[in-house]
A protein has these predicted regions:
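C-terminal motif of bacterial Sec signal peptides marking the signal peptidase cleavage site
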Residues: 15-18
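A short, surface-exposed beta-strand/turn
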Residues: 212-249, 320-355, 446-483
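Positively charged n-region of N-terminal signal peptides that target proteins for export
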Residues: 1-9
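Preferential activation on post-signal-peptide N-terminal prodomains/segments
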Residues: 20-328, 356
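Intrinsic disorder/low-complexity detector
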Residues: 6, 36, 325, 404, ...
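Segments that shape or occlude catalytic/ligand-binding pockets
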Residues: 255, 260-262, 274-442, 454
Length: 483
């Protein structure tokens, strides 16, 4: 069965469109005087095949400059030095400590006793059933014996008392941080700035800021099928482990005790302050220039965390944001920065993905297309759209709709922003081009029903009913559609 919710959560993280409203965003940088005047764009029409309704409404569309360089960028590994700068930007002078599963001698002795019983037939059959096949019993026993042997070896090298170890700014394979994986012998291979191809390594640390516990987690994944360089910093909420309702209640209490909880939405001044704080953080962390938008989000019903501020960033190059970075057909996540804050401005979570570095900037000999050039080209392309050329992953979506017997009644694309900036496209050698582009980001909705199952109109792309992010992007050098 298709997992729509997981897919859409991933898309929300990977397919960022950072065309933001002025009242909730950091001030856009000045890009020069040699630009056209801003445009009002208003149009409603149906595609030539009569299947898709498109509406475009933006009273202040971005102006098109006369020139923008084409940039070649490549993924930037997060080294130990870069990770240290990020941590200092986030936490100031607060000391970070190694994140580990280290146990004291006494605690290991307890684990040895636990696993000496866990390897017995009585324990295994109690966990897996009296009628469990003997082959299964033996496989479970082998796994538990390996853990028992691990603790027996660890006992001789363990400390009598476990005290925090200051962060050593070393990257380890992920197993280093696993339960039953602490390196008591100190023999695990580590890295600081060069990571072998095909390997994923982590640097994890913990700290406190204003009495709130945080984890700081950096990953460099150099595997062939999918690369990743990312940072996560987040509050360490205790694992309450009860029912969902009880967890929400305990989470609410914990957030209140930490001063992170609010039962009302942030007002405009708080949203603006959050964007300003995001700009400060990105500068202090050495992340380059970003443009931010913010929104109040209510997480009370889902997690018990209350109202928070969610800030979304778009990277800025040469004074222009990267408006669209499709993940389709690529082995590297879009460059993104998302932050969650309490209404007070206290950090709750920060996710930074796919840092890039510019390796070449190519000035264009010819001027960019003007709005007079682009408007008819864009409208003509939109009118010729079909399900196949508009709906992301249409073949697989159609296959699923056919399986469940869905009947489409309406496909609608609502565009409320027209943006000038860069669109990221794959290039050779694992790098990317940032292409000057005119973007029409919007919400794509596919409405339909399932005869005999769900007769009332339903959203076929998004079961939560929030639409589906898409962007129609046009190359300002030649007017062609990108992607």
């Amino acid at each position: 069965m298709k997992k729509y919710i997981s897919l859409l959560l991933c898309c929300a993280a990977l397919w960022l469109c950072a065309c933001v409203s002025p009242e909730q965003s950091a001030e856009a940088p000045t890009t020069g005087s040699n630009i056209e005047a801003a445009q009002a764009v208003n149009a409603e029409f149906t595609t030539d095949d009569g299947q898709i309704k498109i509406s475009i409404h933006d009273g202040n569309a971005d102006a098109i400059p006369a020139a923008m360089p084409v940039l070649r960028v490549r993924p930037k590994v997060i080294t130990s030095d870069i990770a240290r700068q990020m941590a200092e930007g986030l936490f100031g002078e607060a000391e970070l400590f190694e994140c580990s599963e280290e146990l004291s001698k006494a605690e290991i002795a307890d684990m040895i006793a636990v696993y000496e019983y866990a390897v017995t037939d009585e324990s295994i059959r109690a966990d897996h059933g009296e009628d469990a096949p003997q082959s299964w019993i033996e496989s479970v026993r082998d796994a538990r014996l390996a853990i028992l042997e691990y603790y027996r070896n660890a006992y001789a090298m363990a400390r009598d008392e476990v005290t925090p170890v200051p962060c050593e700014w070393k990257f380890y394979p992920m197993e280093h941080y696993a339960v039953h994986g602490f390196d008591y012998a100190g023999s695990d291979q580590y890295y600081t700035d060069t990571f072998p191809a095909g390997m994923s390594v982590d640097l994890r640390a913990v700290t406190e800021l204003g009495g709130v516990p945080y984890e700081f987690w950096v990953n460099n994944n150099e595997r062939e099928d999918f690369r990743n360089h990312s940072l996560s910093a987040f509050v360490l909420v205790p694992d309450f482990g009860e029912t969902a309702e009880e967890r929400q209640g305990r989470t609410r209490e914990w957030y209140m005790s930490m001063g992170l909880y609010s039962d009302t939405a942030a007002d405009e001044s708080a949203l603006d302050a959050a964007c300003a704080r995001a700009v400060e953080l990105s500068e202090e962390m050495g992340l380059g220039e970003w443009r931010f938008s913010s929104a109040a989000v209510d997480r009370t019903a889902s997690t018990g965390e209350g109202w928070q501020i969610e800030i979304t960033g778009a990277p800025v190059y040469e004074g222009y944001p990267v408006n669209w970075q499709s993940a389709a057909g690529q082995d590297y996540c879009p460059e993104s920065l998302t932050i969650r804050m309490a209404n007070s401005g206290a950090l709750i979570e920060l996710q930074y993905t796919s840092p890039m570095e510019v390796v070449e900037a190519a000035e264009q000999a010819a001027a960019l297309k003007t709005w007079a050039d682009m408007e008819p080209l864009a409208m003509q392309t939109m009118r010729s759209l079909s399900y196949e050329t508009l709906i992301p992953n249409y073949a697989s979506e159609k296959e699923w709709w056919d399986v469940i017997g869905a009947v489409i009644t309406e496909v609608r694309l609502d565009i409320d922003r027209v943006c000038i900036g860069y669109t990221r496209v794959p290039c050779d050698g694992g790098s990317f081009l940032l292409v000057p582009s005119l973007s029409f980001p919007g919400k794509l909705g596919v409405t339909g029903y399932i005869p005999g199952v769900h007769e009332s109109p339903m959203e076929l792309l998004d079961r939560d009913g929030d639409g589906y992010n898409v962007s129609l992007d046009f190359d300002l050098r030649d007017g062609g559609r990108i992607g």
